[in-house]
A protein has these predicted regions:
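Outer-membrane beta-barrel proteins and related beta-barrel translocases across Gram-negative bacteria
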Residues: 1-169
Length: 169
């Protein structure tokens, strides 16, 4: 398992004296592997924080995730396949917050994913070339939020990640 906790204080010198500080206390992050065998792994993670900024703007979040991913399954034709099931429970409340209400908001999100790839090798007289075409099918039966106005970038490094936009809520 892995457990991290603490508190953080930020100072923004651009703000007026009353709104200059942001307090994050406490915050925690706990993760553990619940099951790991020859078929795959089941992982649990919970993280939360209380954030106070602009004198009276309070936001409290608790996020729980439960992920199951299979080990790679090799077919006779050379395909490497795996699938994953991802559940996320988001609990948020805010006080004087523009994004969240003062009552507890709770969401259950999930994604089902199937990945497949086919490693290919080409031998020449002096070189060996490798290429691996990949495809990922995802189903999200939950409501999806619109992040098109956010400044997020999808690159070749994160295109196959489950959280490729790097969004925490």
């Amino acid at each position: 398992y892995n457990f991290t906790t603490g508190l953080t204080i930020y100072e923004n010198l651009q703000e007026k004296k009353n709104d200059r500080y942001q307090y994050v206390m406490p915050f925690y992050d706990f993760s553990t592997s619940l099951l790991s065998n020859e078929n795959g792994g089941l992982n649990f993670r919970t993280k939360g924080r209380n954030s106070l900024k602009d004198t009276n703007n309070l936001r409290s979040t608790i996020t729980n995730t439960l992920d199951y991913t299979t080990k790679d399954l090799y077919s006779k034709n050379g395909f490497i396949n795996n699938f994953g099931i991802y559940f996320k429970n988001l609990n948020v409340t805010g006080k004087n917050d523009t994004k969240y209400k003062s009552s507890i908001q709770s969401e259950l999100l999930n994604i089902y994913e199937i990945n497949s790839k086919l490693p290919l090798i080409k031998y020449n007289d002096y070189t060996t070339n490798y290429i691996t075409p990949k495809i990922s099918f995802r189903i999200n039966p939950s409501d999806m939020k619109d992040y098109s106005s956010d400044n997020r970038l999808i690159t070749t490094d994160n295109i196959f990640d489950i959280n490729r936009l790097g969004i925490s809520d």
